[in-house]
């Protein structure tokens, strides 16, 4: 997780643009997904029955690129040095390329959330048509406060509850920080109550405790008739000495002084 934090912050610093806070805050969640959970192959990244991963919070793209790099997908350290540069593999927001392990394009808030619901619906349909011996996989994703504020995500979430998409598991990066300050200044929504009211299975965990995250995902996989939302309490910019848990780490480089610390 330290390597993910360092490489994410360094890439944003080199580009002088980007969002280091979310990758640093979701390092444990990302590590658990790629180390313990996702059924994917770096040798056959576009395998039809792979698990899908949706980084709905696409502004935190360096989390995905660092995870793909450390798991031997076709994202090299030189590619990461080209973060946010024209024609690079590592765009500011992820752009779909299944050969690299990037399942969908994300960035506009809420869009990835809704697309993931579509992916889970497709899995459910194709599993019935083709059989579970051919299609039997999960859709996992990381969603942000900003995603959940968007109308498109709530509409899609309600459909997921109606359709009982038990193969859909989202992890909510609940850090209470936006680019403009604390989320609770603009939203008082109880996400647990909201999602439970529309047919979701909801759990709460410490977003920096890997064993809790693993256990929550295991429990969610056992809930066959409901989509799951795992609310991961996290600290944006975790381990940035002076900027963690502040809006300043959301959408700007840490700065040379902070990087040296």
Description of each model-found segment:
Residues 42-43, 98, 102-261:
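Glycine-rich ThDP/TPP pyrophosphate-binding loop and its adjacent helix/strand module
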Residues 1-138:
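Thiamine diphosphate
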